[in-house]
Amino acid sequence: VLSQRTDNYIFHDMSVTDIIADVFSDYGALAEFDDRTSAAYPPIEYCVQYRESDMAFVTRPMEDFGISYSFVHADGSHKLVMSDQNMQVDTVEGATRKFITLSGQDRRTEECIHHFVPERRFASGKTAWKDYNFKKPTAEMHAQKEGTASYEQAGKELYDWPGRYMELGQGQTFAQIKLEAHEAQDKRCMAAGNSPSLFAGSLMTLTDHPVGARNIEYLVLRSQHTFTSQNYRSGGSGGTDSYEGQYELIDSAIPLRPLKVTPKPVVQGPQTAFVVGKQGEEIDCDEYGRILVRFHWDRENDQSMRCRVAQNWAYKQWGGMIIPRIGMEVMVEFLDGDPDRPLVTGSVYNADAMPKYALPANKTRSTWRSNSHKSKGFNEFTFEDKTGGENVFTHAQKDHTTRVLNTRTARVDKHDVYSVGGNRSVE
């Protein structure tokens, strides 16, 4: 049912499990779940569900944080179980299943395993992430983990960018989760038998196998149950119904993490949004000049995370700084197309916020005009490029201060008009 609803929604400062619980809460009994995770998941500053189903949205962060899920079925109901350790899932009824070799038409009424084949699969044994934190621009952010597999080519590395973390410790956790997810693709066991009570996401201990090392506890990854009724076979009536089960197992001592297979939505190009902020303010920014915006697709009147604002120049105590003000329509890009990483790159006019000088009548005029904070004044710097009417105009709403550390040169080829309405002092 979660695949039947798509949404655009913003979550602020919530852990992955809290976000999932919030989504599930809209479905009532249809999304009954049991959170058995034990890890302390950090709050995520900003997480966007962007043009994706609820199912995809909750699955994606589970894969990021290494949370597995399975279902427990009962008469007339089912429950989703979330776990981040194998021991957190249920043990099957009876706990153990004997290995019994069958021959011919031999059938057993007791639940057992009669076919068991260990398999090996090639899996990468090294993972690496890298990311960048603008609050710590020189910090080491290269996270890497390596497994213990000793076979040839086991050291092939899975490297990707960005890792979507702000601290190296979190990056190391993500690298470990990714490593465990790929290592868990190896050492699977394929089994068959008469055990209809085995279900995906349960624990079972095998006994009586002639190879002693195989008599251990397993996590059931997949179970396929086939029932055949003799009453429906051609030319026959009555007879004995039969059952055959196929199971995929893994040693329960091997951490099981889901592979990252759910694609993260990609924002295709820039969007516009309106600047928002504190009630009664015109300008709302933090120490980095970051602002808040509200996207047009947002139906909850929510706001984004603090977004950095691109400037024409930016470096240590020099460069440019213009803070977009509340109500402005701004252009927003997304780093790597990630809806969780907005970046304001400019601003645009609209029908409710038109330029000072009407267009196209003043198309030769280039203007930079500000607005006095919580007032009606302005500062302005304008170039008029109309042939024969070229002009550079400046307007200071209050004071105009010029500081020259060496020589000041002024050359006027014709008239120089200097008018002072008050006092003029020369020091």
Spans of features found by a protein language model:
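Extended, domain-scale alpha-helical bundle/helix-rich regions
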Residues: 14-41, 45-253
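Short, solvent-exposed loop/turn positions at domain surfaces
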Residues: 185, 191-192, 261, 279, ...
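Second-shell loop/turn segments in exported
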Residues: 5-13, 44-48, 261, 311-312, ...
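Short boundary/loop segments of OB/S1/cold-shock single-stranded nucleic-acid-binding domains
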Residues: 253-270
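Short helix/loop capping segments that flank catalytic or ligand/cofactor-binding pockets
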Residues: 3-5, 70, 90-93, 124-128, ...
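Structural signature for extended repeat/solenoid scaffolds and their inter-repeat hinge/linker regions
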Residues: 71, 82-83, 267-427
